[in-house]
Amino acid sequence: VRNAINESVLKQQIIFICAMHDIGKAHPVFQGRDVETNEMLRGYELNQETVSTMFRHEEYAEEMIKRTHLFGFDADKRSEMIIRQIISLHHQKEKERKKEDFMPIKSKIVERWSNIQKYIYNYIKEIFPCEKIEFPNIVFDDPEVGFVVENGILGILIASDWIASNNEAMDNKTIKDFSDVGQYLDWKQKVVTAFLFGENLTRSAFPDVR
């Protein structure tokens, strides 16, 4: 794979996948779980009441990527399938839910939510730009290589999600405390690096090929 794709391009693509993996949270049912947020949504007539507690944002994100015409996800079909699988598995949940547990956005607010989703996606793409995602043929032609690539990216995604959700790894500073996004990201990188160093994880690496 290393010889089939530029390493810096692959890094950008993995960063982008990690950055957008929670796009499925841009849904009124998920956001409405928090009482305060639901009241705010109600004020803008963007809320959607439901009795279902089975909504899974990672599965909804997979559905969103299927409908690429809605927000312009840029990948060839084969690579798109891999990315959908990675994102749908990042919480390792058993799929024992019924079809009705998947909550479509109601027609009267679906267009406005679609615009919100596009805005979030485009904002992520602006901060973490990457070329069209087209994994090399060897990923699809060799099952062992495909397995390693898919699970390698999934592992990076799960680790990054854990770090971003870890109160010990992240301080309380938000983007509002900085003059621009670049300064914010530079600061967070320093904070996370210090945390990982303290956990003896900065020297971790894949074993050499034998």
Write out the residue ranges for each language-model feature:
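N-terminal pre-P-loop "Q-motif" helix
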Residues: 199-210
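Accessory nucleic-acid engagement/destabilization modules that flank
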Residues: 1-201
